[in-house]
Amino acid sequence: MNGSLGVILAGGLATRMGGGDKGVLPLGTSTLLSHVIDRLTPQVDSIALNVNGDGSRFAHLGFPVIADSIDGFAGPLAGVLAGLDWAAEQGVNSIVTAAADTPFFPSDLAARLHREAGGMAHPLVIAATPDPKRGTSRHPTFGLW
């Protein structure tokens, strides 16, 4: 662990799949969200879930549930802002974010992001992968903020 708080971004509307919580979709014997939690937990000091709507539907997971501070489902950056506000309340100045619907991110994502930040006082590093057509594909839901 590296002194970061993890925020799982699960506040989307899932409009392309007709609505609902993508994180609760099954993957094997579990859910997408459970896989993300299992992957992120060893990489951070603690985790919160950024969700919209009735947060009590995630209470059984035992994590703090934080809602966007901006109304109207403003997108994942609103979740990042809510996560940063939550971290500030904990006395921490950075968060590592992961998307609730993308379970197969690196098991050393947080370490990679911190390494790329290189000791920045106010880090901002997002995940990226090589793309033969575009050069680089950025994945801003996975980042160090």
Language-model-detected regions and their locations in the chain:
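Nucleotide and nucleotide-moiety/phosphate-recognizing core
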Residues: 1-145
